[in-house]
A protein has these predicted regions:
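C-terminal motif of bacterial Sec signal peptides marking the signal peptidase cleavage site
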Residues: 23-27
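Bacterial N-terminal signal peptides that target proteins for export
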Residues: 2-17
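OB-fold and OB-like single-stranded nucleic-acid-recognition modules
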Residues: 28-181
């Protein structure tokens, strides 16, 4: 029985390692994900240009409660691809944190919006997930990357309802308004 469990764990770790390696190899080749320009399914007026001002992600996370309406400001990023695949979901990072492009060496990193140069603990405390949902609270089935200025490192102010928040650092906001600077 122990051999079966050990083999299963080895296979799982091996498979996960291959997936991570493949992702890293794609990230290093300098290519970027395709830009999506369609706005199908997004409520009119939900995304607009504006000053994108408000309180940073870290400060909001410290006091946010599930069910309350909040406004927070951040830059789109936090991972190699901060956008959900074919879903209206993305992550934002507190503007006080520095992306790799803020380090002064433009050739340092092919994906500066992943914040790989930032402390992992600070990044976890300063990241929030934003969802644009249907009437049932499910993320819309539309990719939002490139839509109305929603691009990596864009500064956004998001107003919405806290749908999830926990002590492990998770904050999910259902957006009712997004301003893109």
């Amino acid at each position: 029985m122990n051999t079966l469990i050990n083999n299963t764990i080895r296979f799982s770790v091996s498979t996960l390692s291959c997936a991570v390696l493949a992702t890293a190899m794609v990230a290093c080749d300098g290519s970027s994900a395709p830009q999506v320009k369609a706005t199908a399914g997004i409520p009119a007026g939900l995304i607009s240009k504006g000053p994108a001002t408000g309180t940073g992600v870290s400060a909001v996370k410290a006091t946010a409660k599930q069910g309350e309406t909040i406004t927070l400001v951040g830059r789109i990023g936090g991972s190699e691809d901060p956008f959900g695949q074919d879903r209206a979901v993305f992550t934002i990072v507190d503007p006080a944190l520095k992306s790799c492009s803020d380090a002064g060496d433009p050739d340092h990193c092919a994906t500066p919006w992943d914040y790989c140069c930032e402390d992992r603990g600070a990044l976890k405390r300063g990241t929030a997930t934003i969802e644009i949902t249907d009437s049932n609270g499910r993320p819309l089935k539309v990719a939002v990357r490139g839509m109305s200025g929603l691009d990596p490192l864009a500064v956004v102010a998001v107003t919405g309802t806290v749908s999830e928040q926990n002590d492990a650092g998770l904050l999910v906001v259902r957006a009712t308004k997004i301003e893109v600077r």
